[in-house]
Amino acid sequence: MGRDSVVELSANQYPNAVHPQGYQYLTQFEQQPLPTFTYEIDGHILQKTVFMVYGKNATVIEYKNLGKKDIPLTMTPFLVDKDYHSLFHESPVFDFYFEKVGDILKIHSRYGSDPLYIK
């Protein structure tokens, strides 16, 4: 993996396709005590843990570098803000806006929506 290499670790299933194919780097998955995914890319080991905070409308995704070298990490959130019973159709017009508050990114998917916080 070169210094400027980009490796996408996500995997989304679409009709007749899975993109990107980050599952190819998945070396281990543990369900207990928390869902934990371990990825290995050219000797670099990255662990992702996902959990929800009891009693809160919050999901935490934590990344840990288990390797010996630093890994630059860029996040590209895949976000659809809709009720889970609703259908969502592709639209060229989105009203996403964000603001940085200290080390927190506050994202609104449309005017008046509840914000998504990324730290």
Where are the regions a protein language model picked out?
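An extended acidic
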Residues: 1-36, 110-117
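Short small/polar-residue motifs
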Residues: 20-29, 43-47, 92-97
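Short acidic, glycine-rich loop/turn motifs
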Residues: 2, 39-41, 65
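Low-complexity, acidic Ser/Thr/Pro/Gly-rich terminal tails and inter-domain linkers that flank the onset
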Residues: 33-52
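Polysaccharide-binding surfaces and accessory modules of carbohydrate-active proteins
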Residues: 46-47, 51-119
